[in-house]
Amino acid sequence: MISLPGPLVTNLLRFLFLGLSALAPPSRAELQLHLPANQLQAVEGGEVVLPAWYTLHAEVSSAQPGEVPFVMWFFKDKEKEDQVLSYINGVTTSKPGVSLVYSMPSRNLSLRLEGLQEKDSGPYSCSVNVQDKNGQASGHSIKTLELNVLVPPAPPSCRLQGVPRVGANVTLSCQSPRSKPAVQYQWDRQLPSFQTFFAPVLDVIRGSLSLTNLSSSMAGVYVCKAHNEVGTAQCNVTLEVSTGPGAAVVAGAVVGTLVGLGLLAGLVLLYHRRGKALEEPANDIKEDAIAPRTLPWPKSSDTISKNGTLSSVTSARALRPPHGPPRPGALTPTPSLSSQALPSPRLPTTDGANPQPISLIPGGVSSSGLSRMGAVPVMVPAQSQAGSLV
């Protein structure tokens, strides 16, 4: 088919039709255009035929030899009127998807529309002007019909709103994004047993199904059907009713765990800081305490008894053995030396004479030598022959 001319040519063709009608002389033939219906419906994606034909009064219905029709089809949308097909002087021009049902010349002017879309809805006008074999116009007629393109429901989407647990309330929603006319919804449960729902739990306009006080027996596969005059589409959702704790209990357990972990981390951090605080004073340098003074010890010459009588030799009560006399060769500890083995001296007895001083220096070593060796002199008290201290 030849593509349609522009709007300017369309207007010129319309003026041509009007001119032919005005110049037509009076004639016994009267042209009548017939459209059997004022409205037609079709489905999007399909095709439709807009029926139209004309007759001449007092003549047969079929075209006569030399009869020349001029045909134009127009479509008017919300903004402007467009020419979709024309047949003039044996030449047909049309838009894609638009054609005449019968070959021309013919008195049947039916128009076929293919690949319909919703935007093709609107009024269509057919205009016809006929000339006889002598080139004289036999008449002119124009009529309009309305086309309504219906759209079947697009596949809906099913959703579950709420937490499906025992005793809770949930809502099943179903929504189709596109349809003409508007769809209505129906919810059914298919498995494990069939069940149909009605108002008030079912909203056929919004497509919502309210389920209250859930129980385990209400679980199953729920199917939503969206339907209108020209089609049906459906979706489904599986409802599983749980008996576990609710969302609030789970959330509380999670929050409690997080708080416990936070407190534990705080205690560990506090313990770590206190450990550092105790280590720092231990590493500080402190001044040592003053050493005690050393008492002077008497010289070794002062260890001899003033009366010249030495009954026993001892260092101090702390240096004596706790029980019994010291054994020969016992260790005698001193404040500044480790221990030395000193023999226990024996007091010689004389008849009525005063005893002579006995040197306590063993081995014949002098007191000055012992001092150089580190020995410490010890004050020994004198005793009388009766055993009392002098």
Curated annotation (Swiss-Prot):
Extracellular topology ranges: 30-248
Membrane topology of the entry: Single-pass type I membrane protein
Modified residues (Phosphoserine): S301, S336, S339, S344, S371
Sequence ranges assigned to domain Ig-like C2-type in this UniProt record: 156-242
Cytoplasmic-side positions: 270-390
Main location: other
A family per Pfam: Ig_3
Residues bearing the modification Phosphothreonine: T332, T334
Disulphide bond pairs: C174-C224
Residues carrying covalently attached carbohydrate according to the record: N108, N169, N213, N236
Subcellular location: Cell junction, Adherens junction; Cell junction, Tight junction; Cell membrane
Membrane-traversing stretches: 249-269
GO biological process: homophilic cell adhesion via plasma membrane adhesion molecules
Annotated function: Can mediate aggregation most likely through a homophilic molecular interaction.
Descriptive protein name: Endothelial cell-selective adhesion molecule
Primary gene name: ESAM
